[in-house]
């Protein structure tokens, strides 16, 4: 089967078409702008899979309808998923713009005095607004000389932010969400909304009963040699935590081995269901070898599976991590309890950063007063206003231990192409595997337990669906916090101490939902959230605007909010603009 190609970025150099001196004097400068833009994007960006981003430049500068059509024909054949139009001069607005209604698009008008690039930018954006095809504006803050081929820092920031978000849009389009099971314990996010995936993300939903997973395990529809490799890897790397079950529920060595074996098999089979596995065709399972073209998945687990079979904690944690028995590799996106909306937030974060995502319950707000009462410890530093306990038995990526290091030696989570085997081993060494608590998981299983290092910048996100409004996105930038060990132990033992923990302190603004830490917790729209490494809320905002998903809560500086230019026509308050524009334009893939 032919492999689906990755989306490319189309670069459209547009030009004043008047011959006999005007166009000729601009050809080189205009095409050089396109080449410089392509070089920047190719150097600075990668796809989430690690592949280099490719740019496709129009064969000629575009002065009118004929050349615009020729450019579009080329882009259509090259799988261009987003476009950037560049020009240093006046051109003919509506005659030269990209008219594809679903492809994200931006225009960079060169800020120079010799030719009016800004005038074209304004004229072209007016045409986009009038035609109902929003576009992003890129215009340098400072005037440049005509022969200056450099890309200013503010222009570079917008080019990269637009491209990251646009690539995420293009990468999701045409893929599927694998809904493995149904609704878990009444959790609304696991009531998978096909219309949301189709209309806003351009994706399909593949609904598969959990009996398909059982069938693959029981009928050995997997690579048996790989299973042996996985078991050997676990034997070498897994450290086991204490068994907190009552004696009558504790398993012997043989039973524990069977639970581990099935947990690893679940990881293999869910992966194969998502992306396919050619080795299955070798054993006569051609249909199963294809997979479901899934860019994200969710596993219901509770309770119809977990009451009799090992839970999905081990499988989900391994799949979401950037490494397994095959070494360092691209992380998958698998939502525990089939919370598809948290899965979408995970997918967004992964596409924007290329990193693994930390799925968690937004479990408890601990005020400074409560912590001092319970532990005698007075919070300070990042934690001085209180903290939120993020903890869940399921699919937190082991990368979330933050045992990887950036170029300055700081704890972080990195895209897989930057992770060394030593860093992967360090994440494994920081993780214990604790037998599942029988009262919750009668079929057994192992939950990963680690503690996220402190002082690491994170962005917490969540997608919710509101009847009558549609999807909304929540964003909270903040940091992980490290507590003294005795304080952590006291707090952690008040909940389930066999699960992974991140202590999170959101950045406060003193206003609205970010008045204090309690308000962040109180305004969070569901029981789950996602941690993405870095303060990348601005990228989420740009991506959400492309998909027409309003942001109902964020603490990103206003100067970093970057949305299509037409949003400015929807009022003077930028968050009200967002709601009105998203309602006006409707979902990106209107269905």
Curated annotation (Swiss-Prot):
Family classification: Belongs to the L-fucose isomerase family.
Keywords (A to Z) from UniProt: Carbohydrate metabolism, Cytoplasm, Fucose metabolism, Isomerase, Manganese, Metal-binding
GO cellular component: cytoplasm
Subunit structure: Homohexamer.
Protein's pathway: Carbohydrate degradation; L-fucose degradation; L-lactaldehyde and glycerone phosphate from L-fucose: step 1/3
Named cofactor requirement(s): Mn(2+)
Gene3D superfamilies noted in UniProt: 3.40.50.1070, L-fucose Isomerase, Chain A, domain 2 (3.40.275.10), L-fucose/L-arabinose isomerase, C-terminal (3.20.14.10)
Residues that hold Mn(2+) according to the record: 337, 361, 528
SUPFAM superfamilies: FucI/AraA C-terminal domain-like (SSF50443), FucI/AraA N-terminal and middle domains (SSF53743)
Catalytic activity: L-fucose = L-fuculose
Protein's UniProt name: L-fucose isomerase
Compartments where located: Cytoplasm
Biological function: Converts the aldose L-fucose into the corresponding ketose L-fuculose.
Active-site residues (renumbered): 337, 361
MF annotations from Gene Ontology: arabinose isomerase activity; L-fucose isomerase activity; manganese ion binding
Short name of one Pfam family: Fucose_iso_N2
GO biological process, one term: L-fucose catabolic process
Predominant place of localization: cytoplasm
EC code: 5.3.1.25
